[in-house]
UniProtKB/Swiss-Prot annotation:
The modification Phosphothreonine is found at residues 170, 180, 184, 259. GO terms for biological process: actin filament organization; actomyosin structure organization; negative regulation of vascular associated smooth muscle cell proliferation. Keywords: Actin-binding, Calmodulin-binding, Phosphoprotein, Repeat. It comes from Ovis aries (Sheep). It comes from the Eukaryota. GO terms for molecular function: actin filament binding; calmodulin binding. PANTHER family: CALPONIN. Thin filament-associated protein that is implicated in the regulation and modulation of smooth muscle contraction. It is capable of binding to actin, calmodulin and tropomyosin. The interaction of calponin with actin inhibits the actomyosin Mg-ATPase activity. Belongs to the calponin family. This is Calponin-1. SMART domains: CH.
Amino acid sequence: MSSAHFNRGPAYGLSAEVKNKLAQKYDHQREQELREWIEGVTGRRIGNNFMDGLKDGIILCEFINKLQPGSVKKVNESTQNWHQLENIGNFIKAITKYGVKPHDIFEANDLFENTNHTQVQSTLLALASMAKTKGNKVNVGVKYAEKQERKFEPEKLREGRNIIGLQMGTNKFASQQGMTAYGTRRHLYDPKLGTDQPLDQATISLQMGTNKGASQAGMTAPGTKRQIFEPGLGMEHCDTLNVSLQMGSNKGASQRGMTVYGLPRQVYDPKYCLTPEYPELGEPAHNHHPHNYYNSA
């Protein structure tokens, strides 16, 4: 079986865009540093193409065996694809036991099928950092910080409860001291002065407004009746002769005499019509002609 069987075809669309972005993150300077480190440890030449030289997994297995002897029991020298994949899988298991974090490790297909060389490079850099942490002389990677454990006595831990952490704010400079929650009532007296809280309703809180300056005293709610007399003067309305402003005016043009929509309208005006007179018994009826009912003089 040839290795071409495992090669993927060209990527298109979104897959091609993702592949190009991953390729742009590949660092060729780091590749040269990793090449020198691996060749120096194993004593073997990788070749012109760095990833193709690591693709069979042989150099990788020998490399981890140099860092941690006995990590890979058997290294397959065969050119068969499954043997090469087995070497890569054994290398991944070995570096996991060595201490490399799982999220830093590449997958076998990332190297064997050339899908993500950037992740392969990141794994080798993480391996270099772990090797440097373990004391190996490596010029690549960053040494991981060691744990600095501290043990405190219970008395010290209890004392820490009296300290206000920075996350809780500060008790100096400008603060929200004296501020009340939104919607709560604020009084005009200060409890620090030792005065008792008033028991009547004479104290006006700041949230209720002020009793000086312009105010809404005397204002009524929309739709309520407004009287034209002032109750503060001791005047009381005892009759219905006082017309409120909301009822309109009794002077000028008005709607007096208007009827509700739909009611019948009379064609005569009672002011200009006489009261009809009916003939008495024995009186001639011609004197009471219908036209005599109107004042036509």
